[in-house]
Amino acid sequence: MITKAIYPGTFDPITNGHLDLVTRASEMFSHVILAIADSSSKKPMFTLAERVILAKQVTAPLKNVEVLGFSELMAEFAKKHNANILVRGLRSVSDFEYEWQLANMNRHLMPKLESVFLMPSEKWSFISSSLVKEVARHGGDITPFLPAPVTKALMTKLA
């Protein structure tokens, strides 16, 4: 049986923490869609197309991972792609409160859609795309937190 999961997010940019979670999800499920949200409300630094390209580059070794952009409700995207599992990362208690609301709304919209929560590896538990961008803007070393192609793309954006 093929178990298809979706790991959604803005991924602006994709971090080593995200890569850790999608790698672990790829070991748990037959097929994983890394779904990149066209989130205009978050005012992303990278365009959707740029985020998709970067994610494809860094997930290329994961043969059962597909990278797609989306702009519809997650429940609709899941239906369209015949997926019934959402993978979400939980770094903190504050993440849990937000994710709990999302999981319940998604279940209301699509009753068979299950949310699976993964804890990041300890070394990535404090990393967020926003924090990494802030460190980069102030000249800090971001290389430990991002895959090399993403570091290069971020530094180019900030130049």
Curated annotation (Swiss-Prot):
Catalytic function, reaction form: (R)-4'-phosphopantetheine + ATP + H(+) = 3'-dephospho-CoA + diphosphate
> What are the alphabetically sorted keywords of the record?
ATP-binding, Coenzyme A biosynthesis, Cytoplasm, Magnesium, Nucleotide-binding, Nucleotidyltransferase, Transferase
Q: Which Gene3D superfamilies match?
A: HUPs (3.40.50.620)
Pathway membership of this protein?
Cofactor biosynthesis; coenzyme A biosynthesis; CoA from (R)-pantothenate: step 4/5
Q: Where is substrate annotated to bind?
A: T10, K42, M74, R88
- Its main subcellular localisation, reduced to a broad class, is cytoplasm
Binding residues for ATP, per the UniProt record?
Answer: T10, F11, H18, G89, L90, R91, E99, W124, S125, F126, I127, S128, S129, S130
Tell me which EC number(s) this protein carries: 2.7.7.3
Q: How does it assemble?
A: Homohexamer.
Q: Which family does it belong to?
A: Belongs to the bacterial CoaD family.
What's the protein called, per UniProt?
A: Phosphopantetheine adenylyltransferase
Q: Which organism is it from?
A: Yersinia enterocolitica serotype O:8 / biotype 1B (strain NCTC 13174 / 8081)
